[in-house]
Amino acid sequence: MRVVLKLGTSVLTAGTDRLHRPRLVDLMRDIAAVSAQGHEVVLVSSGAVTAGWEALGFPPRERTLAEKQLLAAVGQVQLMHLYTSLAELYGLRSAQLLLTADDFRERTRYLNARTTLEGCLSRGVLPVINENDTVAVEQIKVGDNDTLSAFVANLVEADLLLILTDAPGLYTADPRTHPDATLIPVVERVTPDIWALAGGAGSHRGTGGMHTKIQAAEIATRAGTPVVIAPGDLPEALRRVVDGEALGTRFLAHGTRLEARKRWILAEIAHGRLLLDGGAAQAVRERGSSLLPAGIRQVEGDFERGHTVRLLAPDGQELGRGLTRYRADDLRRVCGHHSREIEALLGYTYGEEAVHRDDLVLL
């Protein structure tokens, strides 16, 4: 089994202001035990900024982007040193990969990242992945490591994404304010009712909360990878989940495993939205047809040819994602028009489809 394991700041600090060394030892022992069983583990880890706080003695408060990037630069070295030392203690080698959204957005970089990860796993090396916070600005940030872990699970075609957190899983209500709230053991599909249970933001040290975890679950399960959200303070949580024990909340994968190109389309961050009319929405949803300009009612966002866009039904429901053949401004000029008018309106044509069905992933 190939598992992507995501560790958030709240798990790594055990609720304190510092990295909790005993917790890190336990987690690495768990990873080593699962690896010894023949499973492959990819680790997505937060904690760099906290490690930087700890190393430089900065007081815990909100900081500017430049200060956070400094802390991440210092802390990533400290964090990776800890992981390397602990991995060696249990007979494992480790490797570091720092990624940004562009590494998922641009196909060549996406393929290079996948090749590197496959090489690590084939040689028994534990990849440790974090977002490259020292260079990432808003335009190239994935945003949080929950979402990053879902993209990584998609990238390596993982059999399971395990997100360890400071909560036992997803509840029917916030258990802090609703004592009668109960744990939801299985989620068959992420629906508006599930989103309503997301609650607020995460810990003051991290960037995630239950909302980002549900978002990660939606991304991964759409691509065919099941997701488990479980408490990070449980002994041997990774091994127990891999062995089939029911811990936390399991989000079931739906649909078949997507082919590699369509996994990439789904992983890429969407640059815009196309609002379809009823006929086009029906043709795309029910017949798997390509999207023609005539079926587009509205174009939102600023994107270039080849970028990923969301396709929305008239009621706003997302039907799928696809690679657009035309840039946003040109699509605005041809939307609602017949395909034979494209060349007359634009002075060129890349074909009659706005999004070809081969470049389209239905959700």
UniProtKB/Swiss-Prot annotation:
SMART domains: PUA. GO terms for molecular function: ATP binding; glutamate 5-kinase activity; RNA binding. InterPro entries: AceGlu_kinase-like_sf, Asp/Glu/Uridylate_kinase, G5K_ProB, Glu/AcGlu_kinase, Glu_5kinase, Glu_5kinase/COase_Synthase, Glutamate_5-kinase_CS, PUA. Belongs to the glutamate 5-kinase family. Residues 271-349 form the PUA domain. It comes from the Bacteria. HAMAP family: ProB. One of its GO terms (cellular component) is cytosol. It is found in: Cytoplasm. Catalyzes the transfer of a phosphate group to glutamate to form L-glutamate 5-phosphate. PANTHER family: GLUTAMATE 5-KINASE, ISOPENTENYL PHOSPHATE KINASE. Pathway: Amino-acid biosynthesis; L-proline biosynthesis; L-glutamate 5-semialdehyde from L-glutamate: step 1/2. Its main location: cytoplasm. This is Glutamate 5-kinase.
